[in-house]
C-alpha cells in the first residue's frame, strides 16, 4: 500500500509512537517511494514523492532516508530537489534503479552507501566491511550459466504469478550451484487429463518435472498421470506435499496393483486409502489453524538419494498438511519398489519416498522450498537440478 491508504493509518500511528518512545537516535524511518519517468517529456518526476512525504508528515513522521525506485539514474539536481522539498540530507536520497534481478539489489544499495548512511544516523560504532564474497560468487554463477535445462512445474494455481514463488526461487538458488539456468515451465494439472498423446507432447521435451503442493480434488488426476509418464520414461521427478501423495497413489495403482488407491481427501469411501487423515486430525471439525504446521524431525535411510543429498541422516523440515501416507500399505509398496527413506522418529509418519529403479524419483511430505536461501540452497533442489542436467546429457548422447 501507500501512505495515503486508510489501511496504513494504524501502522503509521504505531510507528510515530515507537519513534517518540525510542528517540530519533534509536529509530530510523526509511521511506520507499517511486520516481516515475514520463516518456513524452523524457524526465523523472518528483511530485509524487513530495506529496507522499507531505502525507507522512501529516501523521507526525519525518522520514530520515528516501529510497527512490526509478527506471533511470537520479541526477544530482533531482537528488537536491528531493532533499530540499522532503527535508532530508542529499546523501539520504538513495537511488534504487530497476535491476536485472532482485539479487542485484544488495550490491546496488551498497554502491549507494545505504548501509553507511544508516550506521551514521543511528550513531553506531561498528563499521566493519560486509562480507559479500559468497553473494558475489552466487551472482556470478547466476548470470553466467554454462548450460540450461527445462523443468515442468505441474500445479493447480499457475495463473497466479506468486503462487509457487518459493519453488521458483529455490530453483534459482539450486541452478546457481549447478551453474545452470533453470527454465521453469508452468503446466496446469487439469491440462494433463486428456489423451496420453497430449501428455506426451507437454512433457517429452522436459528434463525434469516437479509436482507442486496443493489441496482439494481439482487437477489431482492430471498430476497422477504426469507422474506415471515421468516414472515410465525415467525423467527426474520431485513431488512436494500433495505431489508426494500423488506419487504414492500412482505407484500403488499402476505398479502395486491397487487400482482403486486414492486419498480420502478426494474419495472418502475408497477401498484403498493410501493417503489418509492423520489420526490427530480425524476429530477436528474446525479446520482453521489446525493443520500440522512447522518444523519436525526426520531420520533418513542410509544410502538413499535423500541421505546422499543431505549428507546427513538427521534433518528438520517445515510442514503444512493434514493428510499422510497410510502405513498399513507400507509393505505392499516396498514390494513394488518404493523406498521410504525419511521417517519422523516420534510418529513413524512417512516424510520422504523414493523409487529404487529410477534415476531420480523423490517426494517429500514437507516443504523444502521454505528453507532454501542464496547462501544455503536446499540440498534436495540442488540434487534434483543436478539429476535433470544428467538426464539432459544422457538424452543428448542417445
Predicted regions and their residues:
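N-terminal beta1-alpha1 cap of cysteine-dependent amidohydrolase-like domains
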Residues: 1-314, 319-357, 365-398
Amino acid at each position: 500500500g501507500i501512505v495515503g491508504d486508510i489501511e496504513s493509518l494504524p501502522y503509521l500511528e504505531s510507528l510515530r509512537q515507537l519513534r517518540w518512545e525510542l528517540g530519533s537516535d534509536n529509530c530510523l524511518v526509511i521511506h520507499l517511494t517511486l520516481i516515475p519517468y514520463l516518456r513524452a517529456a523524457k524526465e523523472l518526476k518528483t511530485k509524487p514523492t513530495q506529496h507522499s512525504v507531505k502525507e507522512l508528515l501529516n501523521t507526525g513522521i519525518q522520514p530520515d532516508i528516501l529510497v527512490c525506485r526509478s527506471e533511470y539514474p537520479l541526477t544530482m539536481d533531482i537528488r537536491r530537489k528531493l532533499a530540499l522539498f522532503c527535508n532530508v540530507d542529499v546523501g539520504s536520497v538513495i537511488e534504487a534503479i530497476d535491476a536485472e534481478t532482485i539479487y542485484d539489489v544488495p550490491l546496488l544499495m551498497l554502491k549507494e552507501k545505504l548501509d553507511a548512511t544508516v550506521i551514521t544516523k543511528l550513531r553506531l560504532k561498528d563499521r566493519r566491511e560486509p562480507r559479500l564474497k559468497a553473494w558475489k560468487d552466487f551472482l556470478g554463477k547466476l548470470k553466467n550459466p554454462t548450460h540450461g535445462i527445462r523443468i515442468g512445474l505441474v500445479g493447480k494455481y499457475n495463473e497466479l504469478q506468486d503462487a509457487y514463488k518459493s519453488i521458483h526461487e529455490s530453483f534459482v538458488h539450486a541452478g546457481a550451484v549447478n551453474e545452470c539456468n533453470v527454465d521453469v515451465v508452468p503446466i496446469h494439472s487439469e491440462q494433463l487429463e486428456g489423451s496420453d498423446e497430449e501428455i506426451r507432447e507437454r512433457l517429452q521435451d522436459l528434463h525434469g518435472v516437479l509436482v507442486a503442493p496443493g489441496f482439494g480434488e481439482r487437477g489431482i488426476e492430471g498430476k497422477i498421470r504426469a507422474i506415471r509418464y515421468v516414472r515410465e520414461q525415467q525423467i527426474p521427478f520431485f513431488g512436494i506435499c500433495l505431489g508426494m501423495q500423488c506419487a504414492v497413489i500412482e505407484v500403488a495403482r499402476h505398479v502395486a496393483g491397487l487400482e482403486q488407491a486414492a486419498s480420502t481427501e478426494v474419495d472418502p469411501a475408497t477401498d484403498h486409502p493410501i493417503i489418509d487423515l492423520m489420526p490427530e486430525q480425524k476429530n477436528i471439525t474446525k479446520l482453521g489453524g489446525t493443520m500440522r504446521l512447522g518444523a519436525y524431525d526426520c531420520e533418513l535411510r542410509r544410502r538413499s538419494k535423500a541421505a546422499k543429498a543431505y549428507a546427513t541422516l538427521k534433518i528438520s523440515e517445515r510442514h503444512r498438511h493434514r493428510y499422510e501416507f497410510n502405513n498399513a500399505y507400507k509393505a505392499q509398496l516396498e514390494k513394488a519398489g518404493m523406498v521410504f527413506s525419511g521417517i519422523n522418529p516420534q510418529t513413524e509418519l512417512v516424510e520422504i519416498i523414493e523409487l529404487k529403479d529410477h534415476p531420480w524419483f523423490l517426494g517429500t511430505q514437507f516443504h523444502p522450498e521454505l528453507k532454501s536461501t542464496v547462501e544455503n540452497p536446499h540440498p534436495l533442489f540442488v540434487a534434483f537440478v543436478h539429476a535433470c542436467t544428467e538426464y539432459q546429457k544422457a538424452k543428448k548422447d542417445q
